[in-house]
């Protein structure tokens, strides 16, 4: 089922799986919520909607990634998701990137499709609102025009993609189901989501 809209510019997918998962105590990308490592589960979901899908990781993680999946290594050490997004835009800079963190176990195709359907190409990004009304940077469509702003933040040592979104012209929408944006960073949050999935 390919749901790409060919009247729009190309859309690639990026799974953010290069974090160190310090608070969780184990790699969030390899947690299995649905019988498959989460980084692969998200990549397979994105393949329905995107031209190409890549997994973002640190250089030392590359060999552990299944060879059936394409990889983009982080160009910048210790810069978090912002560095990964810049690395993706450097890799292919003439298309938009749908960037999704690997720690959103309740995310589903309906939510992704809704974001894509509401995409606005004349802003730097289309994103969901968090509970407190802020942009959610880790399930966002970043347009090519975002690159200079992200690079500027990187050069200034400001590694928060959310703050880039807060200062820029973006489209922000409400998720059909806010639970799909629930991210899991700690063992306690993991237990909470496991209870929801039962």
Where on the chain are the PLM-derived regions?
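Nucleotide and nucleotide-moiety/phosphate-recognizing core
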Residues: 2-158, 163-180, 187-197
